[in-house]
């Protein structure tokens, strides 16, 4: 397997710390709102990575955090705690807010076939006390570990204390901005507006490890006792504490978005060096953003985010979204529009239509996996998770002269990685389309040929009123039950 390591700024061979096993930490959601579709892209990407690693022979130990305290607005030390702010808006306590939005994470993961970090299908009704068993770590469950890390950094000379907080001194770290190669002088220019919030702060890039319950935070609802007084952890220490507590002071892969490159991930790396005397992460992977109509990043804080239920309300299937995300490499910016979703839906429906035809030809016999095609499939996966290349392998296989049952068995095997429900959709028993629906569909085709678009629209409406959806494909059309 070769993946793009942001530290090396190139695609490199993955060499596990322990032979045959990879340890992975996924930066997970801050649970103060329903994830927007830009967040979800990342989790689909890393789900496919997890599946690909298992498919190619690795054992995987993976965890994902759930940030339920200390993540400030605009990612600044002295912003508003996002969860406390949402609790105030909704008139609830912060834990109730976190619990509710964790339940929506489970719902969205289940709909999109995103496995739990442990590699199991997600039960959307899972009791939240079972989260840890499935590989999710809640920040509030690791406060003791965070305090222990801050104490160790303090002993090692990487921190200083003010009347408001305990800070990490970034000048003690060589190559602090290793991800962006930005100098501390440039960093100082970039954060100058924050100077003066704490007059005792030594450098604008220094960041909070522990915030005291004083000043604007004197009434902070979530707080714990510590050697530095009553308070709560900074955002960055949470990920360092959770990842190393579970995976150890060395682990293989850390994932996140490119928005983590300027601040969060340099701070995590600095904390690990300050605690252990060395970096903890061998490979850093970062996904790019989704863009919308104006090419602006889909961001909830900008008011342009769309949740999964909102997208599905437009008539799309969850697998249309999964297919779209799989069709573009995780490191490439992806335009998320109705047009791109329409294209993904048409491609997915066309694929299933072809598989159904092959299924009928196979006489429902089980076949054998075609090893030559499997080697091609794995080659694409190992090329920096080139999932679009695996879709091309499937396309080539569909055009081949191989036995129908072998084609199906091989593609079903590939779907262990893609998980587009290909077997279920291909072998559905309710896909016998009534003759009157087929007649309406063919009449719509003829109306379109005659450029009678008003009649064509009328026929489509009649089809949909009967509970079916007609989708145009390169081979003509397909019908599916709504």
Residues covered by each model-derived region:
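The substrate-binding groove and active-site-proximal loops of carbohydrate-active enzymes
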Residues: 85-94, 134-140, 229, 257
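Alpha-helical recognition segments enriched in aromatics with Gly/Pro capping
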Residues: 1-32, 47, 112, 117-123, ...
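N-terminal, positively charged nucleic-acid-binding surface of large information/translation enzymes
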Residues: 8-11, 17-111, 124-127, 472, ...
């Amino acid at each position: 397997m070769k993946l793009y390591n942001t530290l090396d700024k190139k695609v490199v061979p993955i060499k596990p710390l322990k032979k045959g096993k990879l340890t992975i930490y996924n930066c997970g959601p801050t649970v103060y709102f329903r994830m927007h579709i830009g967040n979800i892209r990342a989790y689909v990407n890393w789900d496919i990575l997890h599946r690909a690693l298992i498919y190619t022979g690795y054992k995987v130990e993976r965890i994902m955090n759930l940030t339920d305290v200390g993540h400030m607005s605009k990612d600044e030390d002295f912003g508003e705690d996002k969860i406390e702010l949402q609790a105030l808006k909704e008139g609830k306590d912060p834990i109730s807010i976190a619990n509710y939005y964790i339940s929506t994470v489970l719902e969205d993961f289940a709909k999109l076939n995103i496995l739990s970090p442990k590699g199991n299908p997600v039960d959307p009704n899972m009791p939240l006390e079972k989260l840890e068993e499935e590989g999710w770590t809640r920040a509030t469950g690791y406060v003791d570990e965070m305090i222990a890390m801050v104490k160790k950094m303090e002993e090692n000379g990487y921190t200083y204390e003010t009347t408001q907080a305990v800070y990490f001194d970034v000048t003690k770290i060589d190559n602090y901005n290793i991800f962006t190669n930005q100098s501390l002088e440039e960093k100082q220019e970039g954060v100058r507006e924050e100077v003066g919030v704490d007059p005792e702060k030594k450098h604008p890039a220094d960041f909070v490890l522990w915030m005291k319950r004083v000043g604007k935070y004197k009434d902070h609802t979530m707080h714990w006792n510590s050697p530095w007084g009553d308070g709560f952890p900074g955002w960055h220490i949470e990920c360092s504490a959770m990842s190393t507590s579970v995976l150890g002071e060395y682990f293989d892969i850390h994932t996140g978005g490119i928005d983590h490159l300027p601040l969060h991930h340099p701070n995590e790396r600095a904390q690990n060096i300050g605690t252990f005397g060395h970096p903890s992460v061998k490979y850093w992977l970062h996904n790019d953003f989704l863009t919308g109509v104006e090419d602006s990043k889909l961001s909830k804080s900008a008011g342009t985010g769309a949740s999964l239920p909102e997208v599905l309300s437009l008539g799309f299937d969850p697998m249309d979204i999964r297919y779209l995300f799989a069709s573009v490499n995780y490191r490439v910016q992806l335009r998320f529009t109705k047009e791109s979703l329409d294209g993904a839906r048409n491609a997915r429906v066309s694929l299933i239509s072809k598989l159904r035809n092959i299924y009928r030809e196979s006489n429902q016999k089980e076949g054998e996996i075609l090893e030559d095609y499997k080697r091609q499939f794995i080659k694409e996966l190992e090329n920096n998770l080139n999932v679009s290349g695996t879709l091309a392998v499937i396309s080539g296989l569909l055009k081949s002269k191989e036995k129908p049952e072998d084609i199906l068995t091989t593609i079903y095997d590939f779907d262990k990685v893609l998980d587009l429900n290909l077997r279920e959709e291909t072998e559905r028993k309710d896909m016998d389309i009534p003759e009157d629906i087929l007649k309406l569909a063919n009449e719509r085709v003829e109306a379109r040929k005659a450029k009678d678009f008003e009649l064509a629209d009328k026929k489509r409406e009649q089809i949909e009123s009967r509970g079916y959806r007609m989708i145009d494909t390169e081979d003509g059309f397909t019908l599916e039950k709504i």
